[in-house]
UniProtKB/Swiss-Prot annotation:
NCBIfam families in alphabetical order: atpD
Topological type in the membrane: Peripheral membrane protein
Protein name: ATP synthase subunit beta, chloroplastic
A GO BP entry: proton motive force-driven mitochondrial ATP synthesis
Catalysed reactions, as listed in the record: ATP + H2O + 4 H(+)(in) = ADP + phosphate + 5 H(+)(out)
Function: Produces ATP from ADP in the presence of a proton gradient across the membrane. The catalytic sites are hosted primarily by the beta subunits.
Organism: Solanum tuberosum
Subcellular location, record wording: Plastid, Chloroplast thylakoid membrane
One MF term in the entry's GO annotations: ATP hydrolysis activity
HAMAP family registered for this protein in UniProt: ATP_synth_beta_bact
Subunit structure, interactors included: F-type ATPases have 2 components, CF(1) - the catalytic core - and CF(0) - the membrane proton channel. CF(1) has five subunits: alpha(3), beta(3), gamma(1), delta(1), epsilon(1). CF(0) has four main subunits: a(1), b(1), b'(1) and c(9-12).
Family to which the UniProt record says this protein belongs: Belongs to the ATPase alpha/beta chains family.
Keywords for the protein's UniProt record, in alphabetical order: ATP synthesis, ATP-binding, CF(1), Chloroplast, Hydrogen ion transport, Ion transport, Membrane, Nucleotide-binding, Plastid, Thylakoid, Translocase, Transport
Length: 498
């Protein structure tokens, strides 16, 4: 699907004063604007409020039309703070949706929801812009090839592999490592695949956004010397911003990714952290617009809003967008309408477990809860499929035996079950892995493990060849060869202590 980009300025900066209105009501981030009869703006048109505040400073607030109220009035949601706005201020209808800069000039830069750079590196060197509201590619333009997207993370590649051009959800409560995993994926994909990424920071902490930017500069994903050589564009709408900005920043990031796919014909990675905040912002806007809430207080249009975003994230015959979305799970409840609605759109789910994080196993990916539509023998091959199934069976049996172990102890198990438990504990530890982006905290250098090496490692554990090694040798290592080397070091250390 081809975008028809224009060569006008970004955001809502180029204004023709052809359709002036007046602010008649302000309630928080929601404005009511009156227009002359017969000159009503369309839904999703960008409006700009212009004037001066009480101390004479100029005001330039962009809004998006959400409702046509009758009596020549519209209701709009502000994309920035409404401090200093007063009734009677002039409003300009731009005649089109918000437009944002697209193309190679966006790489290495940080933008807000309006496509304005916020990194103090000057204006963006492009005149090409695209509207943030577009229809999804037509059915005939979609590409249906099935191929694996290797990440270099053992637990992901073996048990819940990602589809190239698919949608992946990272599920987990607060503080279990979603953002760290996303940072690692950006790092691995930029280095191993040379791919272009777009990162949409939706309603998350400003500190995390800053940390991510600094980490990318250090790792070379953003090239400090030559910004044009960077591999990622960043779009932020953080926690402190109005709900309108948080609701639309995901579309801004997606629009930039679509240009790389449709015009540059590239394979793109779109990271959204956090898709729950997109739903949350929509819920806030829905309440501010006076809509009746639905289940658990969410907006009645939850499925429609989610669908309009997710259906644009797809593979076409020109290129692909592989999307990895962090999903905050409120109170760790997967049946909450926000994560439940997200599930319907995903090809793979990576579920992060608080229990594994408490054990110190990172990434804390739950090997039994995480799923992928790609884990089929006809797609990944018999060897990969069989190994993954045996790993899951071993871990499932270990999970079933844990109650017996807690009450009666390991000694009451049969010889066969004791052996299975020992292997399961080795597998559990071997699923951990040192990350490049966590080197500063762990002191261990990061590891990228290829899929063939991952399969070989787990086959050796399952076959019983490594039954004699201590389980701590498998903790936070890359390949199985590193585990055997670590076991030898542990043995030497224990001999020295004797």
């Amino acid at each position: 699907m081809r975008i028809n980009p224009t060569t006008s300025g970004s955001g809502v900066s180029t204004l023709e004063k052809k359709n002036p209105g007046r602010v008649v009501q302000i309630i928080g981030p929601v404005l009511d604007v009156a227009f002359p009869p017969g000159k009503m703006p369309n839904i999703y048109n960008a409006l700009v409020v212009q004037g001066r505040d009480s101390v004479g400073q100029p005001i330039n607030v962009a809004c998006e039309v959400q409702q046509l109220l009758g009596n020549n009035r519209v209701r709009a949601v502000a994309m920035s703070a409404t401090d200093g706005l007063t009734r009677g201020m002039a409003v300009i209808d731009t005649g089109a949706p918000i437009r944002v800069p697209v193309g190679g000039a966006t790489l290495g830069r940080i933008f807000n929801v309006l496509g304005e750079p916020v990194d103090n590196l000057g204006p963006v060197d492009t005149s090409t812009t695209s509207p943030i509201h577009r229809s999804a590619p037509a059915f005939i333009q979609l590409d249906t090839k099935l191929s694996i997207f290797e990440t270099g993370i053992k637990v992901v590649d073996l048990l819940a592999p990602y589809r190239r051009g698919g949608k992946i959800g990272l599920f987990g409560g607060a503080g279990v490592g979603k953002t760290v995993l996303i940072m690692e994926l950006i790092n691995n994909i930029a280095k191993a695949h040379g791919g272009v990424s777009v990162f949409g920071g939706v309603g998350e902490r400003t500190r995390e956004g800053n940390d991510l930017y600094m980490e990318m500069k250090e790792s070379g994903v953003i090239n400090k010397e030559n910004i044009a050589e960077s591999k990622v564009a960043l779009v932020y709408g953080q926690m402190n911003e109005p709900p309108g900005a948080r609701m639309r920043v995901g579309l801004t990031a997606l629009t930039m990714a679509e240009y790389f796919r449709d015009v540059n014909e590239q394979d793109v990675l779109l990271f959204i952290d956090n898709i729950f905040r997109f739903v949350q912002a929509g819920s806030e806007v829905s309440a501010l617009l006076g809509r009746m809430p639905s289940a658990v207080g969410y907006q009645p249009t939850l499925s429609t809003e989610m669908g309009s975003l997710q259906e644009r994230i797809t593979s076409t015959k020109d290129g692909s967008i592989t999307s990895i979305q962090a999903v905050y799970v409120p109170a760790d409840d997967l049946t909450d309408p926000a994560p439940a609605t997200t599930f319907a759109h995903l090809d793979a789910t990576t579920v992060l477990s608080r229990g594994l994080a408490a054990k110190g196993i990172y990434p804390a990916v739950d090997p039994l809860d995480s799923t992928s539509t790609m884990l089929q023998p006809r797609i990944v091959g018999e060897e990969h499929y069989e190994t993954a199934q045996r790993v899951k069976q071993t871990l499932q049996r270990y999970k079933e035996l844990q109650d017996i172990i807690a009450i009666l102890g390991l000694d009451e198990l049969s010889e066969e079950d004791r052996l299975l438990v020992a292997r399961a504990r080795k597998i559990e530890r071997f699923l951990s892995q040192p990350f490049f982006v966590a080197e500063v905290f762990t002191g261990s250098p990061g590891k990228y493990v290829g899929l063939a090496e991952t399969i070989r490692g787990f086959q050796l554990i399952l076959s019983g060849e490594l039954d004699g090694l201590p389980e701590q040798a498998f903790y936070l290592v890359g390949t199985i060869d590193e585990a055997t080397a670590k076991a030898m070091n542990l043995e030497m250390e224990s001999n020295l202590k004797k």
